[in-house]
Each structure stands twice: as structure tokens, then as C-alpha cells.
Regions:
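Short alpha-helical oligomerization interface
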Residues: 19-23
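Short beta-strand segments
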Residues: 6-7, 110-112, 137-140
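Conserved beta-strand scaffold positions in the cores of enzyme catalytic domains, especially
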Residues: 25, 77, 134-136
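Conserved core of the sugar-phosphate nucleotidyltransferase
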Residues: 118-147
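Active-site glycine-rich loops that stabilize anionic/oxyanionic intermediates
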Residues: 10
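Conserved N-terminal catalytic core of the sugar/cofactor nucleotidyltransferase
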Residues: 2-5, 13, 27, 31-110, ...
Length: 147
């Protein structure tokens, strides 16, 4: 199983906070969001590679992060070549880019790099194997006002 962490957005709605730092590298607690994601990925024994897809503006920051990331599997950072919001590929385009670039023909987990979550990826992958079907995880909010 391979994993793609989508981190190629420009986060312009969060400027100036994200003017020089991608959302996935912003801290929650004492570590970047992406560290929380990789920590969850470390529980998935089937996982043998993590691909972080970024843009040209932030790829070097992710490459620096990957050098010290606490991962049980190799992390590869891919630069999708985009330079701003006007030429970004979008989530589906970046997934396709990574699949083509890395020639992935394996089960694939895709996670947005700016999403903080507390559920178990191990349990989610176990569910995936049990159902033997593609799976999508969503959060249902009972109280719309809480959104």
C-alpha cells in the first residue's frame, strides 16, 4: 500500500499566516499537522511508501521536513511544478500526477495534508480489507451550528 499526502495548495485564504509556510507544516501543539498524519500512518503495517505532493513554492520546505520526519517508511516529496493558484492541478490532478510519476499500481491511501484527525488509520485500513472495496472517510456533524 502506498500513501499520498496532498500538500500542493497555496492556502491563500489563510494569508498572511501561510504566505511563507504551507498549511501542512503549520503546528498543532508542538508539531506540524503533517507529523500528526505520518504518526497515524506509522500504525499501518501494509504501508511501504509515502508520497507528499507539493508545489514549486513549498516543495523545498517539504523536502527539508522529510529529512527528519519520523516515518517507518520512505517519504518522497514530489514537486507538481505549479507556481500559483492560477495553474495548480487540484486534488485529482495531483493524485493522477503522483500515480503516473511513481507508476503506482497498488492500494492507495490519500489524505489531505492540512487535515487534523483523531481516528485510527490502522482500523480504517482493516475496514478496507474487510469490505474489499474502495473506501472514503467522512465526518458527519450532528450539530450544523458547530460547523
Amino acid at each position: 500500500m502506498k500513501a499520498i499526502i496532498l500538500a500542493a495548495g497555496y492556502a491563500t485564504r489563510l494569508y498572511p499566516l501561510t504566505l511563507h509556510t504551507p498549511k501542512a507544516l503549520l503546528p498543532i501543539g508542538k508539531k506540524p499537522i503533517i507529523d500528526h498524519i505520518v504518526e497515524k500512518m506509522n500504525t499501518v503495517k501494509e504501508l511501504d511508501a509515502i508520497y507528499v505532493v507539493s508545489n514549486d513554492k513549498f516543495a523545498e520546505q517539504f523536502a527539508d521536513w522529510a529529512k527528519t520526519a519520523k516515518s517507518h517508511v520512505p517519504i518522497t516529496v514530489l514537486n507538481d511544478g505549479t507556481t500559483d493558484d492560477s495553474n495548480k492541478r487540484g486534488a485529482i490532478g495531483d493524485i493522477s500526477f503522483v500515480i503516473d510519476e511513481m507508476q503506482i499500481a497498488d492500494d492507495l491511501m490519500v489524505i489531505a495534508g492540512d487535515n487534523f484527525f483523531t481516528y485510527s488509520l490502522k482500523e480504517y485500513v482493516d475496514f478496507f480489507h474487510e469490505k474489499n472495496r474502495d473506501c472514503v472517510c467522512v465526518k458527519v456533524w450532528e450539530d450544523e451550528a458547530a460547523l
